[in-house]
């Protein structure tokens, strides 16, 4: 009996333990539970802020900004508010909190959210930042979550880890508490008049701050950054020099003696030698060759030499024309005086009209003029209209501009042109003279003159079947009407 009781009690204890475990598993985890370090070691700051706003602050912090700060090393967090209706911002120190457990991040965020809630709801009645109103909300959240939100953080070791620049005063304040003349900062900024306590220190102590500690290799890193800043520039310059195949500074393009787009380099001080072989130019040098006769746009093949070693690759350049070059090139590039070689001939590079002995009399360089014969009278308007009396065509010496063959032959084409015949005018003249009783033979003469080349239908003559007279085919119908009606007019038709 006793043994059964002992077994029953033991089973009951085991059952109670299991029930307690199940009940504890159903309860939500605390915000600062140790298991969060494994489940979510690096939580999302925005997600935590939204969750805490809905749970502890009734959604009043929707307009508040929260973000990380990478330069803040003296405090874990800060909350700023710009007046009533202004912007509220929460900034957490990334350098300090990344070295602390997740619990410290949650408690610091809730601490700053309490400050933001007091700012937003205009309930900031506390003379100090952590007065009764702040403590009321702090205790409320600590009871709900089991967290340990405090007024001040205890991250002193982390703060000292970042304060690696130390200065100490050599005056009397080095023996006074609590600082003993030390100034520790995370940045390399020596104590100066920009500090709010500088004036009091000068009055009470008057000592000078001397730097006694800094991070290892800090000075070398500064010099290394300066050298590294200069190194890319020299590397770029060396790379450009290697691409150009030279170790000398880049010479700007002078515009002479180079071919744009050519990859090979040609020195500006190289010698330019023409590839044409000149045998004897004594006879040609005596002749007068004008500078306009030289074709400057012709490409001359030259060689580029430097240090006595000529390059095999030729370059196309345009050298400046000189008197010797003109005499040489004129023998290889003969000049054409005019395009119309039938009317003019070439005499020493000047156009001279064919059939004349004295070349200077009719040369174009002397400014002579050539008259164009007038054309025939225009037959269309039945009036004598002559073309311009003369057309002056002047060609400069040594150029290829002259009268073309089309201009010279345009006059013959105009003379051989057939004028258009105004048939209606000619027929009206015949009709009027016939009705007035005039002689058809006399009236036909101006008609024949005005219409020398009419069409076949107008010039064709037919015999009248009534009076057997010869009449124009175009007038046969009217003539037959008069003959058949027995017109009183006794006119007989004449031969046209």
Curated annotation (Swiss-Prot):
Q: How is its activity regulated?
A: DNA-binding activates the protease activity: single-stranded DNA-binding specifically activates ability to cleave covalent DNA-protein cross-links (DPCs). In contrast, double-stranded DNA-binding specifically activates autocatalytic cleavage, and subsequent inactivation.
Q: Where is this motif: PIP-box?
A: 326-333
Cofactor (UniProt): Zn(2+)
Q: One GO term of the cellular component aspect?
A: nuclear speck
According to the UniProt record, list the residues that bear N-acetylmethionine: 1
SprT-like domain boundaries:
45-212
Here the segments flagged for biased composition (Polar residues) are: 426-437, 445-457
Per the record, the coiled-coil ranges are none
Principal subcellular localization = nucleus
Zinc finger spans (UBZ4-type)?
461-488
**Which InterPro entries is this protein grouped with?**
Rad18_UBZ4, Spartan, SprT-like_domain, SPRTN_ZBD
Q: Which comment does the entry carry about domains? A: The PIP-box mediates the interaction with PCNA, while the UBZ4-type zinc finger mediates binding to 'Lys-48'- and 'Lys-63'-linked polyubiquitin.
Per UniProt, subunit arrangement is: Homodimer. Interacts (VIA PIP-box) with PCNA (when ubiquitinated). Interacts (via its SHP-box) with VCP/p97. Interacts with RAD18. Interacts with KCTD13 and POLD3.
Would you tell me the protein name for this molecule? DNA-dependent metalloprotease SPRTN
Organism, as annotated = Rattus norvegicus
